[in-house]
Amino acid sequence: SEGQLMRIVITGASGNVGTALLRRLAAAGSAHDLVGVVRRPPEPAGPYESVHWHSLDVAGADAADRLRPIVAGADAVVHLAWGFQPTRNTDYLSRVGVGGTAAILDAAHAESVGHLLHMSSVGTYAAGRYGCRVDESWSTSGIASSPYSRDKSAAEAVLDRYEHEHRGTGVAITRMRPGFIVQRGAASGQMRYFLPGYIPMSVITHLPVLPLDRRLCIPIVHADDVADAFARALDRGAAGAFNLAAEPPVSRDDVADALGARAVHLPSAVLGRLVDLSWRARLQPIDRGWSDMAFSVPLLDCGRARTELGWQPRWSAA
């Protein structure tokens, strides 16, 4: 409940949003008992210093059993753990994303945890409304050609089945559905997912032209604002789904301006084929699904987050 000190378990607590959430909770002056679950615990400094760390891979077959003593006695579990690489090992990524979600939910239910907050994504939404805003009732069947989107959709289906089976009893579930998450401090880490190791980061900021479809129109949100939404939902015990995005949406010209490049129209279908060919040739590590998702996902109506959480993004997408 609001203002009450809680024991909070956070999976993926050292990642982009996890780090932002630790900073947000510290800035609020709270003395919550924070527990981090990650594969490789970070050095106990800065935002990581006051966290009790556990090393655990949520993709493991025994993850649910190993998570039970960790979540025992917790007031809430924030599930942020997700895998992005290697994109060629989709089985492992599914075990992290879908299997990990099932494991943390099983453990939370077994230990009677009251609240699970799950990091979903705009990627869980179906195509069909590109460039238009949708609320949380839009289909969560995902983008079929994107492994990331399929897994985000499947993870929500795990939550759907649980809620259907328990019908208002058991763990209360919150689903955050942010747009594409950005954070200046994590930019090199994010770009490393999408670039081969032999390409220096400086290349990205020295592109003379940006070949991209002029239709590009995607929702983005800053990691700090996503963390703020999680903190507000924790305080309020708010359940349900919440869209999170900054305004305005990001266009192709916005991306070109940010990179100091000249935008050149390249149809998304052609871009998708180029991404796929270069991925198959192992020239770069991003699969075509990311390109397909960027030209399929809708924009986000965030009225529910504003009304129920009092959430307002501090960072503009401009």
Model-derived regions, located:
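N-terminal Rossmann NAD(P)H-binding glycine-rich loop of SDR-like oxidoreductase domains
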Residues: I8-S30
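Alpha-helical substrate-binding/gating segment
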Residues: Y198-P249
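Conserved Rossmann-fold NAD(P)-dependent oxidoreductase catalytic core, especially the SDR/UDP-sugar
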Residues: G99, A103-Y148
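Mid/C-terminal beta-alpha module of Rossmann-like enzyme folds, strongest
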Residues: A227-R288, C302
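C-terminal amphipathic/interface module of NAD(P)-dependent oxidoreductases
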Residues: R262-H265, I286-A318
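NAD(P)-dependent short-chain dehydrogenase/reductase
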Residues: H166-I218
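Active-site Tyr-X1-5-Lys
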Residues: S145-T174
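NAD(P)H-binding glycine-rich loop region in Rossmannoid oxidoreductase-like domains
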Residues: S55-G99, A107, A127
